[in-house]
């Protein structure tokens, strides 16, 4: 199969802003194309931006969001090695985020 180069004019890595949500949700839909509605809500993204803006990153190619990395900081003493995703994210409420914690926990990454 012959591959054709794709022209890219601009690649940007920056902090996620709530104004990005429409594009971000479109990316979620493409990434999770199995028909499930397992993606972050506007309210959840807003909370992540409010509590830890520097931990929410997007990759933008030619003004289009093509990836993201979402994270929180947690205290390892409260999480330990045998945690579940629900436990470490506070069942996706992010009430486990602790700015004084000692672990950066990635809760979503895709490109």
Stretch-by-stretch model annotation:
Residues 1-79:
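Short amphipathic alpha-helix that is part of the acyltransferase structural core
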Residues 69-110:
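Conserved acyl-donor/pantetheine-binding loop and adjacent beta-alpha core of acyl/acetyltransferases
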């Amino acid at each position: 199969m012959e591959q054709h180069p794709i022209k890219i004019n601009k690649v940007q890595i920056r902090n996620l802003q709530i104004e990005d949500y429409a594009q971000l949700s479109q990316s979620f839909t493409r990434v999770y194309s199995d028909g499930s509605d397992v993606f972050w809500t506007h309210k959840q993204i807003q909370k992540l931006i409010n509590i830890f803006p520097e931990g929410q990153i997007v990759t933008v190619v030619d003004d289009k969001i093509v990836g993201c990395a979402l994270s929180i900081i947690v205290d390892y003493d409260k999480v330990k090695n045998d945690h579940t995703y629900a436990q470490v994210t506070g069942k996706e409420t992010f009430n486990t985020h602790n700015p004084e914690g000692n672990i950066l926990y990635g809760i979503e990454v895709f490109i």
